[in-house]
Amino acid sequence: MKIMRKSHPLFKIVNHAFIDLPTPPNISGWWNFGSLLGMCLILQISTGLFLAMHYTSDTLTAFSSVAHICRDVNYGWLIRYMHANGASLFFICLYMHIGRGIYYGSYLYKETWNIGILLLFLSMATAFVGYVLPWGQMSFWRPTVITNLLSAIPYIGQDLVEWIWGGFSVDKATLSRFFAFHFILPFIITALATVHLLFLHETGSNNPLGIPSDCAKIPFHPYYSTKDFLGALLLIMFFMTLVLYFPDKLGDPDNYMPANPLNTPPHIKPEWYFLFAYAILRSIPNKLGGVVALVLSILVLAFLPYLHTSNQRSLMFRPLSQSLFWTLVADLLLLTWIGGQPVESPFIIIGQVASILYFTIILILMPLAGLIENKMMKW
């Protein structure tokens, strides 16, 4: 008699995806972040659902409804802080996942990589509209400033901004539609993540050496399911420490004041996980140029498969490309810091240099390093 997980139509899908999945025998802990992202997504959807039960998307009551959740709802404060800090955790895992993909050449699986870029854009959109919902000072001023950048688009810019706002300013219509977007987008992300997995399982996982491992693959369970469980346990420990001891560490104090259109905060900035893109946006004095640079800061990832010049897939044995990769990581950290600073000297020039370096490394230096390494290896 056949085992049910191998014969039942529904269990068979789960079996092929998570139990008997042929997996390279040498993948490291850097491959854990995919499953951790799945865990973060489940956490965000479940906590968000409970918050949506008590939240009201009206400009008059939104701020007080969040206060009501924290004060009067049983464990509401915990659900709220888990959801708020869960977004930070999600983006930490996301950036680690992308970094691993770049380092080990996983971007050569073009379909999987492009779906991943689309998932990144959708995740950023979800986080952006979600930050508006508490209707604090930063919740109001941030979308006002960021969405107003779309007015730089020729011909349709101003109409597009007013269409997004639902009026001539960020108001009740904006809050209602942003709440609707914030509710539906995670489910679209879940569907796309399934497609992402589907494409990945068509090709099989990459490995640190970047070489085919079809002849030596092992089943995912119990080897990697145990490893993923350990990763999840460590992440939960870090996450709960953050939520219970430092819940407001990654937030903005201005958001504890109700939204006031007549009082502008001294320094409007996005959440920490968008600061690198915000710094690139600010580094260009022209409004339209800044918007284009902002989009390209993420879209540039789509060029990576076409800029790969090395005969080796992974950076494991490519010291020149390795040094460029870690320079890129340092540059992104510098941009994140700059994005949180006021627009004044010397931060302006540092941001401009770091922005130029970001695009130069990805578009010019890394392909060049691949060619040099090929020459050094006499390939």
From Swiss-Prot:
Cofactor dependence: heme b
Residues noted as binding a ubiquinone in the record, renumbered to the chain: 201
Keywords, comma-separated and alphabetical: Electron transport, Heme, Iron, Membrane, Metal-binding, Mitochondrion, Mitochondrion inner membrane, Respiratory chain, Transmembrane, Transmembrane helix, Transport, Ubiquinone
Keyword Protein biosynthesis applies: no
Cofactor note: Binds 2 heme b groups non-covalently.
Binding positions for heme b b566 per the UniProt entry: 97, 196
Primary location: mitochondrion
Gene3D superfamilies: Cytochrome Bc1 Complex, Chain C
Segments traversing the membrane: 33-53, 77-98, 113-133, 178-198, 226-246, 288-308, 320-340, 347-367
Cellular component terms (Gene Ontology): mitochondrial inner membrane; respiratory chain complex III
UniProt-annotated binding residues for heme b b562: 83, 182
PANTHER family per the UniProt record, alphabetical: CYTOCHROME B
Family in the record: Belongs to the cytochrome b family.
Protein name, UniProt field: Cytochrome b
